[in-house]
Amino acid sequence: MGGMFPSAASAPGAANNLLNFLRAEDAALLAPHLKPFSSKPNAVLYHHGDHVGTVYFPCGATLVSFLISMEDGGTVETTMVGREGAVGGIVSQGKLPAFSQIMVQFGGEFLAMPVEALDAAKAKSRSLDNLFSRYADCLMAQMFQSTACNAAHGIEQRAAKWIIAAVDRTGELEVPLTQERLASMLGVGRSYISRIIQRMKRDGILSVRRGKLKIHDPKQLAARSCGCNDAVKAHFELILQGIYPADTDGCQTPLRASSGT
């Protein structure tokens, strides 16, 4: 249904899979309210306690993170959302203040609409309400899996999982991520991440340049990871088949290295 939406969703490779999954009549309910929105990395869409008034649909390689602030002033990521989903009032329906900070991890394009408009559309369409309820289930499952992963798996497994999840959602084999940022996302010291990245470089899995990680061997990277990302994928396929990004499909870019590399 990408052609019914504004330019951010209709441009090749810049789709949002959740919106493209809509039935034509449901897409028609949302289309008048969706507006293109661009953001640079590190922009905060919501702070803890903010009123949630807008739903954001990441498009293409745009990626956002849910962050929890810690007592020492640092932040730890609980989950990430890309073109497979949306953020802002999805679970609480916008009636409650934001608990986590929602930050743009990889900048790019969004489609945005008022929470009230989405709620009104869901009230008119049982199928639309059902779709977003199922997506909320997938989002919560991802958060639960992240909690278990942080408790049960080692730093290298979690680091590999994070990179794989970012590649899945962006469709890019070059991830704009510094080692310091990855350490912050995982809630660990940078020295741990530096040693892990050095081992991966030595083994030909990835290389580092200009604040980016370029993946050369996704299969080896997956072998270093835990199974948590696969568990999230499997749940998406069970609840919302076709939403979670595949290597290629008709509404998103193929898995590839970025241009100019």
Residue ranges and their predicted role:
Residues 164-261:
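Phosphate-/nucleic-acid-contacting segments
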